[in-house]
Amino acid sequence: MSIVQNKKAFHDYFIEEKHEAGAVLEGWEVKAIRAGRAQLKEAYVIIRNGELFLIGCHVSPLLAASTHIQPDPVRTRKLLLHAEEIKRLIGKVERAGYTLVPLDIHYKKGRIKLEIGLAKGKKQHDKRESEKQKEWERDKQRLMRPK
């Protein structure tokens, strides 16, 4: 069940692989994400010292859940993956011109997980072509629908 989706990522990138990662979150962040108060629109994933970090994900704190601390809505959050997965992703990102983008935040067995995609950027004409293809699929469905 998806909590937050990054639709802009599918518009701006060709997603080639998807990976599920855990995230190191604080208590107030978990409560806010469960309430749907997170945004992935301008978020991205970087590699630092062989670890993955989520940058730019905005989590608006709940007033009731964050009274005793000073919450930082856009703090850097560490992502948790197996070491082999991280090594493979680092190799592709550094060598082949790929980037890592967050696709959505969802639950899995009661835990909050982040789906990241190994992606290649789209050019402007690729974006136009994708949009034309989507429109054609919608028109096809509309024409095939019984009246």
UniProtKB/Swiss-Prot annotation:
This chain's protein is named SsrA-binding protein
**What family does this belong to?**
Belongs to the SmpB family.
Question: Pfam families, from UniProt?
Answer: SmpB (PF01668)
Basic and acidic residues biased stretches: 126-147
Alphabetized CDD domains for the sequence: SmpB (cd09294)
Record keywords, A-Z:
Cytoplasm, RNA-binding
One cellular-component annotation, GO: cytosol
What's the superkingdom here? Bacteria
Purpose: Required for rescue of stalled ribosomes mediated by trans-translation. Binds to transfer-messenger RNA (tmRNA), required for stable association of tmRNA with ribosomes. tmRNA and SmpB together mimic tRNA shape, replacing the anticodon stem-loop with SmpB. tmRNA is encoded by the ssrA gene; the 2 termini fold to resemble tRNA(Ala) and it encodes a 'tag peptide', a short internal open reading frame. During trans-translation Ala-aminoacylated tmRNA acts like a tRNA, entering the A-site of stalled ribosomes, displacing the stalled mRNA.
Task: Indicate where this protein is primarily found.
Answer: cytoplasm
**HAMAP family, per this entry?**
SmpB
Q: Which InterPro entries match?
A: SmpB, SsrA-bd_prot
Give a GO biological-process term.
trans-translation
Gene Ontology molecular function, alphabetical: RNA binding
Transmembrane annotation, as ranges:
none
The protein's location, in the record's own words, is: Cytoplasm
Q: Which intervals of the chain are annotated as region Disordered?
A: 119-147
